[in-house]
């Protein structure tokens, strides 16, 4: 809240959110809620791409709330940026229409922002730029899966439980051997692993880019909406380890701790 920030005599952290999810307006709360729980004052800055068509979006909402990367960093650069996923794992990165603009933004953010968080597809994209390409699956990895922290003393992972769960919703993964090779070569630091999902949380060696291939921000309602959407396609299995009759969010602590860092 701006008035509370003024009374606390602190400057809110300006966090850019590059939202490329379909039906982006409906998705916004998934990020706003955990960010709002931070003890720090957060000013979300919604960012749009100039080369993305936003076919499923409310364009009035997009144009009223979202600004370009250049506008978001003028006159002062952002403190950090979150880049969402997008259901485009089947495409080679260079085939994505907005790939060049995406690369420009993440390269500039690495120099101007304290940290970049890439979720799901954005995490894959950052891994690709670090030298590890995704492997596309025949079937969607969908459900809630256990992960194990690999670096308990890490500034981020040290706040997490040694084992925790997180939603996954993706058609791709990163080969274990290539990820381990990237760590040996000093390109990536591996932070969390799941037996059925592979290396899911990792970071660049300079700790300025954090990649999370899961969807810690998802609510139960978001998963249910994806189930309904997938039913129409008819080619996606039901989510694993997820009770459709329960409203419990068992990954809440992981989500909240992640977004409060």
Where are these regions (language model features)?
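Cysteine-nucleophile active-site neighborhood
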Residues: 78, 83-154
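N-terminal beta-loop-helix "entrance" segment that forms/cooperates
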Residues: 50-64
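Helical hinge/lid and interdomain linker segments adjacent to catalytic or ligand-binding clefts
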Residues: 60-69, 93
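Amide-donor transfer/coupling interface in amidating biosynthetic enzymes
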Residues: 1-51, 66-67, 73, 77, ...
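Short, glycine/acidic-enriched capping/hinge loops at junctions between secondary-structure elements
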Residues: 27-30, 56-59, 93-94
